[in-house]
Amino acid sequence: MKKFLVLTVFVFMFSSCGSQGQIVTSNVNTVEVKTSLRPKLVVGIVVDQMRYDYLTRFESKYGEGGFKRMINEGFNCKNSHFNYVPTYTGPGHASIYTGTTPKNHGIIGNNWYDKTTKKMVYCAGDDSVESVGTTNKAGKMSPRRMQTTSFADENRLFTQSQGKTIGISLKDRGAILPAGHTANAAYWFHGRDEGAWISSSFYMNELPQWVLDFNKSEAAESYLKVWNTVYDISTYTESGADENNFEGGFKGKDKATFPYDLAALSKENRGFDILKATPYGNSLTTDFAMAAIKAEHLGQDDITDVLTVSYSSTDYVGHNFGVNSKEIEDTYIRLDKDLERFFNYLDATIGTGEYTIFLTADHGAIDVPSYLQSMNIPAGYLDNKATKTKFEKYVEAKFKNSELIENVSNNQIFLNRTTIDSLGLNINEVQESMVNELIAYKNVNKVFSAFTMTTTDFTTGIEALLQNGYNQKRSGDVILVPKSNYISYSKTGSTHGSGLNHDTHVPLLFFGKGIKHGETLNKTVIPDIAPTISALLGISFPNGSTGIPLGFVIE
């Protein structure tokens, strides 16, 4: 990439936007736009399933160079929330980088029912592209289902594609959606018996040599080792007992207790995929991110590059072992060390004060409901099968037809419009009838129709969150809200997806060039991140952005 962004201008005189430096012009001359006031590299870090209280709960175990460095030298938004439902990985990553909600960017879940094809679709799935780096279908992915731009896209447009964008994550959606539509590359990890970083023909026809070399280096193999706690387990007083009834564990091991021999357990746990559910998946991601910076020469000139890194292992560990486990505590202690290692690398290769980082999460997580029950806190599990059977009987009795329902998924009901029309029924009346039926069901807290979502302007409460997550083209006809602390999940491990604070309240840290030192308890929302970074860079906001730049964060 060039050190200066070269533009051709005519008679006009321009003065710079604050972050772009000074522009000197003359008639029909080549103009050098100095961009040294902008960071050389923006790194977006998403920690999958990180609740805000993990920053404070494990604080005594963190070193000075990871999370604490961001807090002590950067800006801490202590009351940052997702402003929509559902709080899943796909929508979370899309919302962080596009500056808007599923209502606009269209990623309404990890998977959803497509009303046109009558099939379930995956948020990053794309059968029109081919896998690169594997013969497995795991590479048939792209960002095409995301309907708006990311700030990384806008940076590519602003720099005439001279600023690079690369996305990295163990999860495909965690790499693809943040990097946007114009990324140079997105890479994700394919486990099983391969243990390799792969991509898609959306970005390239073959892996670059540095990725091939990394895959051949046996980096993944090196982490198939014993996982034990970093410190003496007796000092892990911020979490529950190591042996309890609330954790899943790994196949091939009777108890979900330390230590874990990953090499031995890998055979019964999908080979290299076992790494995803350990902190070593985060370490491998860090290794690969640093290799990308070196090989792609990111941040080596004055034209801003963007690197998106999503740490997925925290989510896998949380789902498996739960919020209160020793395993989740050790995972965050180790992630803190990986962050310190990563920041030190950025200091050495980009230069201290020459890069900007933000760190947040794509959603939080609920405490294991069975654990909450043991603490006398109201919680439980949904019997979706029984609810669906009861509801289908109602529909058949009410409308004398068993084909009105096409799909039930993500707490939404999709109706068969063709059948409803053929019966001469009014769609709005059918929806409202179902709302009145479902609201009487046990463990259902609220129910809304698509008609209500599209004709009523909600500004507060779960209704506003649902509306921000409702996409008229893609969402269902009836939307259910389960009773608080009731989930559709196994009785071990944790999950997420609700509009409650345990799922919406996540960290938001800014650090590096152009960032003030401070903190705020004023409420901020996730869509504010992208326009804040855009304002820092002096570029256009993402085209669907509804967030507000956090001016108090920027110097």
Language-model features, listed with the residues they occupy:
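Bacterial Sec-dependent N-terminal signal peptides
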Residues: 1-33
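Active-site-proximal N-terminal segment of extracellular/periplasmic enzymes that hydrolyze or transfer
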Residues: 23-75
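Beta-strand elements within well-structured catalytic alpha/beta cores of enzymes
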Residues: 39-51, 70, 96, 155, ...
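Short, structured active-site-proximal loop/turn typified by the sulfatase FGly-forming signature C/S-X-P-X-R
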Residues: 55-104, 164-168
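Secreted, luminal/periplasmic, and some membrane-associated catalytic domains
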Residues: 62, 79, 88, 110-140, ...
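Short, solvent-exposed turn/loop segments enriched in Gly/Ser/Thr/Pro and often Arg
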Residues: 77-95, 167-175, 310-312, 361-364, ...
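His/Asp/Glu-rich, glycine-adjacent segments
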Residues: 101, 109-303, 312-319, 440-442, ...
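Substrate-binding rim/cap in mid-to-C-terminal beta-strand-loop elements of soluble/periplasmic
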Residues: 386-425, 495-537, 554
